[in-house]
Amino acid sequence: MARANPRRRATAAKDKWKMKEWFVVYAPDFFGSKEIGLTPADEPEKVIGRVVETTLKDLTGDFTKGHVKLYFQVYDVKGQNAYTKFKGHTLARSYIRSLVRRRTTRVDGIFNITTKDGYKLRVMGMVIAYRRIQTSQERAIRRIIQDIIYKKAEELNFADFVLQSVNGQIASEIAKEARKIYPIKRAEIRKIKVLAEPEA
């Protein structure tokens, strides 16, 4: 079987790369429609579906938010512009590790919720208590995480729920209530995943 000439293969690959265009990727409206990256493709259709990762620091300029990772998926391309929708967020593992030290208790809660405008999300909340706590206290704190997340989902539309999650507002409410049970170090919404969008 004849083998392709390595030089020809390299030239073909180079030519294919030259044919690609760069598309500017934008965040959704509720994140200010800011530019979040560039992506290459030889056809606009190939850009659709791509997921772009950025941080809240890059979007807002707030250097304290570098640990908040955001994921956006391209759903539409017009000209050289690619438009995205929010797919989820997570906190950097190194940040979470920095919170969880010896003699602390990590309380997690994972909940499937529906926002006021019909988006189905999986939301993961987390509270770090300063010391080892009793099982009853752990249950009480987990219930607080659950109650506040469900309450916010009933009150807020998708965009506002996401914004209040990633900027720490919902976590602040959780922390305020959890401190009535036991002194805590930190509360966070550590992850959101979009499960389903409302039917058009």
Swiss-Prot record:
Keyword annotations from UniProtKB, A to Z: Ribonucleoprotein, Ribosomal protein
Pfam families in UniProt: Ribosomal_S3Ae
Signal peptide coordinates: none
Taxonomic superkingdom: Archaea
InterPro entries: Ribosomal_eS1, Ribosomal_eS1_arc, Ribosomal_eS1_CS
GO BP terms in the entry: translation
GO cellular component annotations of the record: ribonucleoprotein complex; ribosome
GO molecular function terms attached to this record: structural constituent of ribosome
Family membership noted in the UniProt record: Belongs to the eukaryotic ribosomal protein eS1 family.
HAMAP family reported for this sequence: Ribosomal_eS1 (MF_00359)
This protein's name: Small ribosomal subunit protein eS1
